[in-house]
Amino acid sequence: MSHKPAHLLLVDDDPGLLKLLGLRLTSEGYSVVTAESGAEGLRVLNREKVDLVISDLRMDEMDGMQLFAEIQKVQPGMPVIILTAHGSIPDAVAATQQGVFSFLTKPVDKDALYQAIDDALEQSAPATDERWREAIVTRSPLMLRLLEQARLVAQSDVSVLINGQSGTGKEIFAQAIHNASPRNSKPFIAINCGALPEQLLESELFGHARGAFTGAVSNREGLFQAAEGGTLFLDEIGDMPAPLQVKLLRVLQERKVRPLGSNRDIDINVRIISATHRDLPKAMARGEFREDLYYRLNVVSLKIPALAERTEDIPLLANHLLRQAAERHKPFVRAFSTDAMKRLMTASWPGNVRQLVNVIEQCVALTSSPVISDALVEQALEGENTALPTFVEARNQFELNYLRKLLQITKGNVTHAARMAGRNRTEFYKLLSRHELDANDFKE
Protein backbone atom coordinates (compact mmCIF):
# COMPACT_ATOMS: atom_id res chain seq x y z
CA MET A 1 0.00 0.00 0.00
CA SER A 2 1.46 3.37 -1.00
CA HIS A 3 1.02 6.43 1.20
CA LYS A 4 1.76 10.11 0.86
CA PRO A 5 4.76 11.27 2.93
CA ALA A 6 3.46 12.63 6.24
CA HIS A 7 4.75 13.36 9.74
CA LEU A 8 2.69 11.61 12.42
CA LEU A 9 2.63 12.13 16.20
CA LEU A 10 1.81 8.98 18.21
CA VAL A 11 0.73 9.39 21.85
CA ASP A 12 0.39 6.41 24.22
CA ASP A 13 1.49 5.85 27.82
CA ASP A 14 2.39 2.21 27.03
CA PRO A 15 6.00 2.38 25.71
CA GLY A 16 5.80 -1.12 24.21
CA LEU A 17 2.66 -0.46 22.19
CA LEU A 18 3.98 2.97 21.23
CA LYS A 19 7.18 1.47 19.84
CA LEU A 20 5.32 -1.29 17.99
CA LEU A 21 2.91 1.11 16.31
CA GLY A 22 5.76 3.49 15.50
CA LEU A 23 7.74 0.73 13.78
CA ARG A 24 4.70 -0.40 11.82
CA LEU A 25 3.94 3.10 10.53
CA THR A 26 7.60 3.86 9.80
CA SER A 27 7.78 0.69 7.71
CA GLU A 28 4.84 2.03 5.70
CA GLY A 29 6.82 5.15 4.81
CA TYR A 30 5.45 7.59 7.36
CA SER A 31 7.72 9.83 9.42
CA VAL A 32 6.90 9.24 13.09
CA VAL A 33 7.52 11.06 16.38
CA THR A 34 6.27 9.60 19.67
CA ALA A 35 5.17 10.89 23.08
CA GLU A 36 4.37 8.90 26.24
CA SER A 37 1.86 11.40 27.62
CA GLY A 38 -0.57 14.04 26.47
CA ALA A 39 1.61 16.80 27.94
CA GLU A 40 4.65 15.53 26.05
CA GLY A 41 2.55 15.33 22.88
CA LEU A 42 1.63 19.01 23.21
CA ARG A 43 5.31 19.90 23.61
CA VAL A 44 6.08 18.02 20.39
CA LEU A 45 3.36 19.96 18.57
CA ASN A 46 4.91 23.21 19.76
CA ARG A 47 8.30 22.41 18.27
CA GLU A 48 7.53 20.31 15.16
CA LYS A 49 5.28 20.48 12.12
CA VAL A 50 2.95 17.50 12.45
CA ASP A 51 0.33 16.40 9.91
CA LEU A 52 -1.73 14.03 12.08
CA VAL A 53 -2.03 12.91 15.73
CA ILE A 54 -2.86 9.32 16.72
CA SER A 55 -3.57 9.00 20.45
CA ASP A 56 -4.63 6.31 22.88
CA LEU A 57 -7.85 7.11 24.73
CA ARG A 58 -7.03 5.83 28.23
CA MET A 59 -3.94 7.59 29.62
CA ASP A 60 -3.07 8.90 33.08
CA GLU A 61 -3.28 12.66 33.80
CA MET A 62 -4.55 13.62 30.33
CA ASP A 63 -6.63 11.15 28.30
CA GLY A 64 -7.03 11.14 24.53
CA MET A 65 -10.16 13.30 24.48
CA GLN A 66 -8.59 15.87 26.81
CA LEU A 67 -5.52 15.92 24.56
CA PHE A 68 -7.80 16.42 21.55
CA ALA A 69 -9.44 19.40 23.26
CA GLU A 70 -6.04 20.98 23.99
CA ILE A 71 -4.87 20.40 20.41
CA GLN A 72 -7.96 22.15 19.06
CA LYS A 73 -7.06 25.24 21.10
CA VAL A 74 -3.62 25.60 19.53
CA GLN A 75 -4.08 23.91 16.11
CA PRO A 76 -7.80 23.81 15.32
CA GLY A 77 -7.44 22.03 11.99
CA MET A 78 -5.19 19.21 13.23
CA PRO A 79 -6.77 15.79 12.48
CA VAL A 80 -6.77 13.38 15.46
CA ILE A 81 -7.39 9.63 15.45
CA ILE A 82 -8.25 8.02 18.81
CA LEU A 83 -7.41 4.38 19.57
CA THR A 84 -8.95 2.49 22.48
CA ALA A 85 -9.31 -1.04 23.81
CA HIS A 86 -12.48 -0.06 25.67
CA GLY A 87 -14.48 1.67 22.98
CA SER A 88 -18.20 1.52 22.38
CA ILE A 89 -20.47 2.87 19.69
CA PRO A 90 -21.72 5.74 21.93
CA ASP A 91 -18.08 6.64 22.71
CA ALA A 92 -17.23 6.70 19.02
CA VAL A 93 -20.27 8.81 18.15
CA ALA A 94 -19.50 11.28 20.94
CA ALA A 95 -15.86 11.56 19.89
CA THR A 96 -16.64 12.17 16.22
CA GLN A 97 -19.33 14.70 17.15
CA GLN A 98 -16.68 16.66 19.02
CA GLY A 99 -14.44 16.65 15.94
CA VAL A 100 -12.22 13.57 16.35
CA PHE A 101 -11.56 12.34 12.83
CA SER A 102 -11.75 8.61 13.58
CA PHE A 103 -12.29 6.40 16.63
CA LEU A 104 -10.75 2.91 16.23
CA THR A 105 -10.91 -0.06 18.58
CA LYS A 106 -7.81 -2.03 19.58
CA PRO A 107 -6.42 -4.32 18.33
CA VAL A 108 -6.54 -2.07 15.30
CA ASP A 109 -6.88 -3.62 11.87
CA LYS A 110 -3.85 -2.27 10.01
CA ASP A 111 -5.70 -1.64 6.74
CA ALA A 112 -8.43 0.24 8.60
CA LEU A 113 -5.78 2.33 10.34
CA TYR A 114 -3.91 3.10 7.09
CA GLN A 115 -7.18 4.05 5.40
CA ALA A 116 -8.14 6.32 8.30
CA ILE A 117 -4.72 8.01 8.14
CA ASP A 118 -4.95 8.55 4.38
CA ASP A 119 -8.51 9.87 4.66
CA ALA A 120 -7.54 12.23 7.48
CA LEU A 121 -4.56 13.59 5.58
CA GLU A 122 -6.65 14.02 2.44
CA GLN A 123 -9.44 15.85 4.26
CA SER A 124 -7.06 18.07 6.23
CA ALA A 125 -5.02 19.08 3.17
CA PRO A 126 -5.01 22.85 2.63
CA ALA A 127 -7.68 24.22 0.36
CA THR A 128 -5.04 25.54 -2.00
CA ASP A 129 -3.76 22.96 -4.46
CA GLU A 130 -0.35 21.75 -3.30
CA ARG A 131 0.31 19.52 -6.31
CA TRP A 132 2.77 22.10 -7.63
CA ARG A 133 5.35 20.92 -5.05
CA GLU A 134 4.44 17.22 -4.81
CA ALA A 135 7.89 16.14 -6.09
CA ILE A 136 9.60 17.91 -3.16
CA VAL A 137 9.48 15.67 -0.08
CA THR A 138 10.31 17.69 3.02
CA ARG A 139 9.30 18.72 6.52
CA SER A 140 12.42 20.82 7.12
CA PRO A 141 11.56 24.34 8.32
CA LEU A 142 14.33 25.63 6.02
CA MET A 143 12.77 23.99 2.98
CA LEU A 144 9.21 24.87 3.94
CA ARG A 145 10.16 28.56 4.19
CA LEU A 146 11.90 28.29 0.83
CA LEU A 147 8.83 26.68 -0.73
CA GLU A 148 6.66 29.50 0.57
CA GLN A 149 9.03 32.01 -1.05
CA ALA A 150 8.91 29.97 -4.27
CA ARG A 151 5.11 29.96 -4.23
CA LEU A 152 5.03 33.75 -3.91
CA VAL A 153 7.69 34.29 -6.57
CA ALA A 154 5.84 31.97 -8.96
CA GLN A 155 2.96 34.43 -9.28
CA SER A 156 5.13 36.98 -11.09
CA ASP A 157 7.39 36.70 -14.12
CA VAL A 158 10.60 37.87 -12.45
CA SER A 159 13.79 35.95 -13.20
CA VAL A 160 14.86 33.55 -10.45
CA LEU A 161 18.39 32.32 -9.73
CA ILE A 162 18.56 29.09 -7.73
CA ASN A 163 21.80 28.45 -5.87
CA GLY A 164 22.80 25.14 -4.36
CA GLN A 165 25.31 22.34 -4.35
CA SER A 166 25.18 19.64 -7.02
CA GLY A 167 22.51 17.09 -6.27
CA THR A 168 20.27 19.29 -4.10
CA GLY A 169 17.41 19.23 -6.61
CA LYS A 170 17.62 22.63 -8.30
CA GLU A 171 15.76 21.47 -11.42
CA ILE A 172 12.94 19.91 -9.36
CA PHE A 173 12.64 23.21 -7.49
CA ALA A 174 12.51 25.15 -10.77
CA GLN A 175 9.81 22.79 -12.02
CA ALA A 176 7.82 23.45 -8.83
CA ILE A 177 7.99 27.22 -9.41
CA HIS A 178 6.73 26.68 -12.95
CA ASN A 179 3.93 24.43 -11.68
CA ALA A 180 2.77 27.12 -9.24
CA SER A 181 2.86 29.87 -11.86
CA PRO A 182 0.18 31.07 -14.30
CA ARG A 183 2.40 29.54 -17.01
CA ASN A 184 1.92 25.98 -15.73
CA SER A 185 -0.13 24.86 -18.74
CA LYS A 186 2.74 25.81 -21.07
CA PRO A 187 6.09 24.00 -21.53
CA PHE A 188 8.81 23.71 -18.91
CA ILE A 189 12.08 23.13 -20.76
CA ALA A 190 15.46 22.56 -19.12
CA ILE A 191 18.98 22.66 -20.52
CA ASN A 192 22.36 22.19 -18.85
CA CYS A 193 24.54 25.07 -20.04
CA GLY A 194 27.73 23.29 -19.01
CA ALA A 195 27.09 20.02 -20.82
CA LEU A 196 27.32 21.17 -24.45
CA PRO A 197 30.04 22.73 -26.63
CA GLU A 198 29.53 26.42 -27.34
CA GLN A 199 28.17 26.18 -30.91
CA LEU A 200 25.81 23.33 -30.07
CA LEU A 201 24.55 25.18 -26.98
CA GLU A 202 23.95 28.31 -29.07
CA SER A 203 22.00 26.31 -31.63
CA GLU A 204 19.97 24.56 -28.91
CA LEU A 205 19.03 27.83 -27.24
CA PHE A 206 18.43 30.11 -30.20
CA GLY A 207 17.77 27.70 -33.07
CA HIS A 208 19.39 27.83 -36.49
CA ALA A 209 18.58 28.46 -40.12
CA ARG A 210 19.29 25.98 -42.86
CA GLY A 211 22.95 26.16 -43.88
CA ALA A 212 24.02 28.02 -40.73
CA PHE A 213 26.78 25.45 -40.23
CA THR A 214 27.84 22.06 -41.51
CA GLY A 215 25.03 19.63 -40.84
CA ALA A 216 22.30 22.29 -40.56
CA VAL A 217 20.15 20.80 -43.32
CA SER A 218 16.91 22.47 -42.23
CA ASN A 219 15.55 25.28 -40.10
CA ARG A 220 15.25 24.37 -36.43
CA GLU A 221 13.61 26.32 -33.63
CA GLY A 222 15.57 26.78 -30.42
CA LEU A 223 14.51 26.18 -26.84
CA PHE A 224 13.45 29.80 -26.36
CA GLN A 225 10.83 29.23 -29.05
CA ALA A 226 9.96 25.73 -27.81
CA ALA A 227 9.28 27.16 -24.34
CA GLU A 228 6.98 29.89 -25.71
CA GLY A 229 4.52 30.96 -23.03
CA GLY A 230 6.20 28.74 -20.46
CA THR A 231 9.47 28.52 -18.56
CA LEU A 232 13.05 27.97 -19.74
CA PHE A 233 15.34 26.57 -17.06
CA LEU A 234 19.03 27.32 -17.61
CA ASP A 235 20.89 24.88 -15.38
CA GLU A 236 24.56 25.48 -14.52
CA ILE A 237 24.36 28.99 -15.97
CA GLY A 238 27.76 29.70 -14.40
CA ASP A 239 29.37 27.40 -16.97
CA MET A 240 27.94 29.25 -19.99
CA PRO A 241 30.74 30.41 -22.35
CA ALA A 242 31.36 34.17 -22.36
CA PRO A 243 30.25 34.80 -25.99
CA LEU A 244 26.90 33.17 -25.27
CA GLN A 245 26.48 35.25 -22.12
CA VAL A 246 26.46 38.34 -24.35
CA LYS A 247 23.82 36.84 -26.65
CA LEU A 248 21.69 35.68 -23.73
CA LEU A 249 21.79 39.17 -22.21
CA ARG A 250 20.55 40.64 -25.50
CA VAL A 251 17.67 38.15 -25.62
CA LEU A 252 16.64 38.99 -22.06
CA GLN A 253 16.82 42.73 -22.73
CA GLU A 254 14.96 42.73 -26.05
CA ARG A 255 12.70 39.71 -25.60
CA LYS A 256 13.69 38.65 -29.09
CA VAL A 257 15.80 35.77 -30.35
CA ARG A 258 17.70 35.48 -33.62
CA PRO A 259 18.46 31.92 -34.81
CA LEU A 260 22.00 31.13 -35.98
CA GLY A 261 22.42 32.02 -39.65
CA SER A 262 19.23 34.10 -39.75
CA ASN A 263 18.75 37.86 -40.08
CA ARG A 264 15.25 37.78 -38.61
CA ASP A 265 14.39 38.41 -34.96
CA ILE A 266 11.59 36.38 -33.37
CA ASP A 267 9.54 37.70 -30.44
CA ILE A 268 9.57 35.43 -27.39
CA ASN A 269 7.50 35.18 -24.24
CA VAL A 270 9.25 32.97 -21.68
CA ARG A 271 10.00 33.04 -17.99
CA ILE A 272 13.67 32.44 -17.13
CA ILE A 273 14.77 30.40 -14.14
CA SER A 274 18.48 29.67 -13.86
CA ALA A 275 20.61 27.69 -11.45
CA THR A 276 24.24 27.21 -10.51
CA HIS A 277 26.44 25.51 -7.95
CA ARG A 278 29.15 28.13 -8.54
CA ASP A 279 29.77 31.33 -6.61
CA LEU A 280 28.81 33.79 -9.36
CA PRO A 281 30.02 36.96 -7.55
CA LYS A 282 33.48 35.36 -7.39
CA ALA A 283 33.18 34.36 -11.05
CA MET A 284 32.33 37.98 -11.88
CA ALA A 285 35.37 39.20 -9.95
CA ARG A 286 37.52 36.85 -12.05
CA GLY A 287 35.94 38.13 -15.26
CA GLU A 288 34.26 34.79 -16.01
CA PHE A 289 30.66 35.91 -15.67
CA ARG A 290 29.07 39.14 -16.84
CA GLU A 291 27.84 41.43 -14.10
CA ASP A 292 24.98 42.82 -16.20
CA LEU A 293 23.75 39.31 -17.00
CA TYR A 294 24.00 38.32 -13.33
CA TYR A 295 21.67 41.12 -12.28
CA ARG A 296 19.23 40.25 -15.07
CA LEU A 297 19.07 36.64 -13.88
CA ASN A 298 19.25 37.30 -10.14
CA VAL A 299 16.10 39.37 -9.57
CA VAL A 300 15.13 36.85 -6.90
CA SER A 301 17.68 34.47 -5.40
CA LEU A 302 16.74 31.18 -3.73
CA LYS A 303 19.33 28.96 -2.05
CA ILE A 304 18.57 25.27 -1.61
CA PRO A 305 20.21 23.87 1.53
CA ALA A 306 22.49 20.85 1.34
CA LEU A 307 21.02 17.58 2.59
CA ALA A 308 23.42 17.75 5.56
CA GLU A 309 21.67 20.99 6.60
CA ARG A 310 18.25 19.32 6.75
CA THR A 311 18.88 15.92 8.27
CA GLU A 312 15.30 15.82 9.59
CA ASP A 313 14.29 15.15 5.96
CA ILE A 314 16.47 12.05 5.60
CA PRO A 315 14.00 9.50 7.10
CA LEU A 316 11.15 11.01 5.09
CA LEU A 317 13.17 11.07 1.86
CA ALA A 318 14.72 7.66 2.44
CA ASN A 319 11.35 5.98 3.00
CA HIS A 320 9.82 7.80 0.03
CA LEU A 321 12.68 6.78 -2.26
CA LEU A 322 12.63 3.22 -0.90
CA ARG A 323 8.95 2.88 -1.79
CA GLN A 324 9.61 4.15 -5.31
CA ALA A 325 12.59 1.84 -5.86
CA ALA A 326 10.76 -1.15 -4.37
CA GLU A 327 7.72 -0.60 -6.59
CA ARG A 328 9.98 -0.61 -9.66
CA HIS A 329 12.23 -3.53 -8.74
CA LYS A 330 11.35 -5.52 -5.59
CA PRO A 331 7.89 -4.93 -4.11
CA PHE A 332 8.68 -7.13 -1.09
CA VAL A 333 11.21 -4.58 0.25
CA ARG A 334 9.46 -2.66 3.02
CA ALA A 335 11.76 -0.73 5.35
CA PHE A 336 15.19 0.11 6.76
CA SER A 337 16.45 -1.45 9.95
CA THR A 338 16.88 0.94 12.88
CA ASP A 339 20.68 0.84 12.53
CA ALA A 340 20.45 1.35 8.77
CA MET A 341 18.37 4.49 9.26
CA LYS A 342 20.82 5.74 11.89
CA ARG A 343 23.66 5.32 9.38
CA LEU A 344 21.71 7.23 6.74
CA MET A 345 21.07 10.00 9.28
CA THR A 346 24.75 10.35 10.22
CA ALA A 347 26.29 10.10 6.72
CA SER A 348 27.86 13.28 5.34
CA TRP A 349 26.07 13.25 1.94
CA PRO A 350 28.48 15.31 -0.19
CA GLY A 351 26.37 14.35 -3.22
CA ASN A 352 23.15 15.45 -1.48
CA VAL A 353 19.78 13.99 -2.54
CA ARG A 354 21.22 12.59 -5.76
CA GLN A 355 23.64 10.51 -3.71
CA LEU A 356 20.84 9.37 -1.38
CA VAL A 357 18.87 8.20 -4.43
CA ASN A 358 21.86 6.21 -5.67
CA VAL A 359 22.49 4.62 -2.27
CA ILE A 360 18.87 3.51 -1.91
CA GLU A 361 18.69 2.19 -5.47
CA GLN A 362 21.79 0.11 -4.77
CA CYS A 363 20.40 -1.18 -1.47
CA VAL A 364 17.16 -2.29 -3.12
CA ALA A 365 19.05 -3.92 -5.98
CA LEU A 366 21.23 -5.97 -3.62
CA THR A 367 18.84 -6.90 -0.82
CA SER A 368 17.08 -10.26 -0.53
CA SER A 369 15.28 -9.23 2.66
CA PRO A 370 12.20 -7.04 3.22
CA VAL A 371 14.29 -4.92 5.60
CA ILE A 372 17.39 -3.04 4.37
CA SER A 373 20.26 -3.86 6.73
CA ASP A 374 22.87 -1.54 8.18
CA ALA A 375 25.62 -3.55 6.46
CA LEU A 376 23.99 -3.01 3.07
CA VAL A 377 23.71 0.75 3.63
CA GLU A 378 27.36 0.85 4.73
CA GLN A 379 28.38 -1.02 1.57
CA ALA A 380 26.35 1.30 -0.64
CA LEU A 381 27.83 4.40 1.00
CA GLU A 382 31.35 3.06 0.51
CA GLY A 383 30.52 2.30 -3.12
CA GLU A 384 29.39 5.89 -3.59
CA ASN A 385 32.94 7.01 -2.92
CA THR A 386 33.89 5.49 -6.27
CA ALA A 387 30.63 6.23 -8.09
CA LEU A 388 30.66 7.87 -11.52
CA PRO A 389 30.56 11.68 -11.41
CA THR A 390 28.07 13.69 -13.45
CA PHE A 391 29.08 14.75 -16.97
CA VAL A 392 29.82 18.32 -15.86
CA GLU A 393 31.85 17.13 -12.85
CA ALA A 394 33.82 14.75 -15.07
CA ARG A 395 34.47 17.47 -17.65
CA ASN A 396 35.63 19.92 -14.99
CA GLN A 397 37.97 17.31 -13.53
CA PHE A 398 39.34 16.56 -17.01
CA GLU A 399 39.94 20.27 -17.65
CA LEU A 400 41.76 20.63 -14.33
CA ASN A 401 44.00 17.61 -14.98
CA TYR A 402 44.61 18.70 -18.58
CA LEU A 403 45.62 22.24 -17.58
CA ARG A 404 47.94 20.96 -14.87
CA LYS A 405 49.60 18.63 -17.38
CA LEU A 406 50.03 21.46 -19.91
CA LEU A 407 51.62 23.72 -17.30
CA GLN A 408 53.91 20.93 -16.15
CA ILE A 409 55.04 20.24 -19.73
CA THR A 410 55.57 23.93 -20.53
CA LYS A 411 57.03 24.70 -17.07
CA GLY A 412 54.41 27.41 -16.53
CA ASN A 413 54.84 29.14 -19.92
CA VAL A 414 51.30 30.38 -20.59
CA THR A 415 51.93 31.36 -24.22
CA HIS A 416 53.30 27.92 -25.05
CA ALA A 417 50.57 26.14 -23.07
CA ALA A 418 47.78 28.16 -24.73
CA ARG A 419 49.22 27.36 -28.17
CA MET A 420 49.30 23.63 -27.37
CA ALA A 421 45.69 23.82 -26.18
CA GLY A 422 44.55 25.69 -29.29
CA ARG A 423 43.38 28.69 -27.27
CA ASN A 424 44.42 32.33 -27.19
CA ARG A 425 46.11 33.68 -24.06
CA THR A 426 43.00 35.48 -22.81
CA GLU A 427 40.84 32.35 -22.99
CA PHE A 428 43.61 30.29 -21.43
CA TYR A 429 44.00 32.68 -18.50
CA LYS A 430 40.24 32.47 -17.91
CA LEU A 431 40.49 28.68 -17.82
CA LEU A 432 43.32 28.89 -15.30
CA SER A 433 41.31 31.33 -13.20
CA ARG A 434 38.21 29.12 -13.27
CA HIS A 435 40.23 26.21 -11.93
CA GLU A 436 42.22 28.44 -9.54
CA LEU A 437 45.56 27.52 -11.11
CA ASP A 438 48.61 29.82 -11.04
CA ALA A 439 51.15 29.30 -13.83
CA ASN A 440 53.91 30.58 -11.53
CA ASP A 441 53.50 27.46 -9.39
CA PHE A 442 54.76 25.38 -12.31
CA LYS A 443 57.85 27.44 -13.17
CA GLU A 444 61.24 26.00 -12.32
From Swiss-Prot:
Keywords noted in UniProt: ATP-binding, Cytoplasm, DNA-binding, Nucleotide-binding, Phosphoprotein, Transcription, Transcription regulation, Two-component regulatory system
InterPro entries, A to Z: AAA+_ATPase, CheY-like_superfamily, Homeodomain-like_sf, P-loop_NTPase, Sig_transdc_resp-reg_receiver, Sigma_54_int, Sigma_54_int_dom_ATP-bd_1, Sigma_54_int_dom_ATP-bd_2
Protein name per the record: Transcriptional regulatory protein GlrR
UniProt xrefs under PROSITE patterns: RESPONSE_REGULATORY, SIGMA54_INTERACT_1, SIGMA54_INTERACT_2, SIGMA54_INTERACT_3, SIGMA54_INTERACT_4
Domain Sigma-54 factor interaction as annotated: residue spans: 136-366
Keyword DNA-binding found: yes
Main location: cytoplasm
